[in-house]
């Protein structure tokens, strides 16, 4: 089977949507097709506050989610929905998506991973600071699509949100305390469940749970092809970059999510480059 109908089957099987997708190639039984990963958090705008039944709104929501549909709101002004430009650039915090980085940065990840796989650059893939796991899910999905069974995807996070700034040691983090933001506190079990929903939770996915200063220097990582930093703060960026940079293979990628948006992160990278 080929074409749109087959794409719909694949989307249904993997619980994903076809709107604003990131697609990557894969093959099964000699048939090449595009596997679709949802990027935008909503597929359909369903107002459950006016749902007539049968069943309750919560039951309807659960049923829709099993088919890859996402509920965007429970009523209200449609103008309050997330702006597509914000979502594309990753400048909002979507309520249900597995990632907040947006389509442009996801395309950057896709391009980097494709280059690593196509050119045979050795090493594993890691993201430090994963939120709900979307970027690392994409990484693992691409390994599957390329038939790479050797590399691992490392999922590194405190799974407790960000640390409170230690301004005595890292004065550049002063005024950037988001340690109490509950939206950023996504537990490891939830991230594992997100991987599992795509059928991608397996031995090639390794979790590093804890603060970066406590986990990354001792992590059993020999070589990296991609190091993606998403720690926001000077401290978190430094705690990840210092132990891992030397493990990046020649031709590999270091991607810094917050370099253009968070001054503490930018300063940490600039200082590291000056010192090295």
Stretch-by-stretch model annotation:
Residues 111:
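Short internal alpha-helix immediately C-terminal to a glycine-rich phosphate-binding loop
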Residues 1-6, 12, 20, 62, ...:
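Short, intrinsically disordered, charge-balanced linker/junction segments flanking boundaries
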Residues 23, 48-50, 62, 71:
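Class I S-adenosyl-L-methionine
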Residues 4, 21, 46-48, 78, ...:
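Short linear motifs in intrinsically disordered/low-complexity regions
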Residues 14, 28-44, 57, 61, ...:
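S-adenosylmethionine/decaboxylated-SAM
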Residues 17, 25:
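Alpha-helical ligand/cofactor-binding cores
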Residues 105-108:
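N-terminal pre-P-loop "Q-motif" helix
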């Amino acid at each position: 089977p080929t074409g749109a109908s087959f794409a719909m089957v694949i989307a249904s099987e993997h619980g994903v949507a076809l709107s604003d997708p990131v697609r990557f190639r894969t093959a099964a039984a000699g048939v090449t097709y595009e596997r679709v990963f949802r990027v935008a958090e909503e597929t359909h705008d369903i107002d459950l506050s006016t749902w007539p039944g049968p069943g309750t709104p919560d039951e309807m929501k659960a049923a829709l989610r099993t088919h890859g549909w996402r509920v965007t709101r429970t009523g209200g002004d449609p103008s309050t929905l997330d702006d597509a430009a914000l979502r594309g650039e990753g400048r909002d915090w979507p309520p249900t998506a597995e990632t907040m980085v947006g389509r442009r940065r996801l395309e950057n990840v896709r391009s980097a991973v494709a280059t690593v796989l196509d050119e045979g650059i050795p090493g594993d893939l890691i993201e430090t600071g994963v939120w709900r796991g979307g970027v690392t899910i994409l990484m693992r999905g691409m390994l599957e699509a390329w038939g790479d069974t050797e590399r691992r995807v490392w999922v590194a996070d405190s799974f407790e949100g960000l640390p409170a700034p230690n301004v005595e040691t890292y004065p550049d983090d002063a005024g950037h305390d988001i340690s109490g933001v509950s939206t950023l506190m996504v537990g490891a079990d939830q991230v594992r469940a997100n991987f599992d929903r795509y059928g991608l939770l397996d031995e090639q996915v390794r979790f590093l749970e804890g603060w970066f200063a406590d986990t990354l220097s001792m992590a059993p990582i020999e070589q990296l092809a991609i190091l993606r930093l998403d720690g926001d703060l000077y401290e978190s960026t430094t705690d990840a970059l210092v132990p891992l940079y030397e493990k990046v293979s020649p031709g590999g990628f270091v991607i810094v999510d917050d370099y253009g948006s968070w001054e503490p992160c930018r300063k940490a990278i600039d200082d590291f480059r000056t010192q090295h």
